[in-house]
Amino acid sequence: MVRSKQVGNHKSDKKKNISKLWKTKRRVKDLDQIHHDMKPENAKLLLNQEIDYQLPGNAQHYCLHCSRYFVDLKTLKEHFKTKVHKRRLKQLREEPYTQEEAERAAGMGSYIPPKLINVQTQDTMEMS
């Protein structure tokens, strides 16, 4: 008898549901893409978007760190207090993986540990 893939409560790699890992419908941006979005010139564009009626809140309330749109300013401010947002800030503290770091890991240079970046929650602008 063949053993089937177990899908349990604990989060070890053996027990994860493989089909859920490959689904791309609700896939969020990777951390290096969010670091790119956090640069001042890109952040300004994302936080001051034109009105888009297809997105929640007409694309006016956007969390830069989680890459999510919210319905209104109150919901966005509540999101800043959640565990999900705080976890994402903690993940973003480590600087993104670069080609130079990959070359050092392959033996072409000495290892330099990744630096920690100070990441703070974005400012919310009150719209009147």
Swiss-Prot record:
Residues 1-21 are annotated as: Disordered. GO terms for molecular function: nucleic acid binding; preribosome binding; zinc ion binding. Pfam families: zf-C2H2_jaz. It comes from the Eukaryota. GO terms for biological process: ribosome biogenesis. A zinc finger (C2H2-type) spans 61-85. It is found in: Nucleus, Nucleolus; Cytoplasm. Residues 12-21 have a biased composition (Basic residues). One of its GO terms (cellular component) is cytoplasm. Keywords: Cytoplasm, Metal-binding, Nucleus, Ribosome biogenesis, Zinc, Zinc-finger. Involved in pre-60S ribosomal particles maturation by promoting the nuclear export of the 60S ribosome. Negatively modulates the DNA binding activity of Oct-2 and therefore its transcriptional regulatory activity. The protein is largely disordered, with the exception of the zinc finger domain. Associates with pre-60S ribosomal particles. Belongs to the ZNF593/BUD20 C2H2-type zinc-finger protein family. This is Zinc finger protein 593. The gene is znf593.
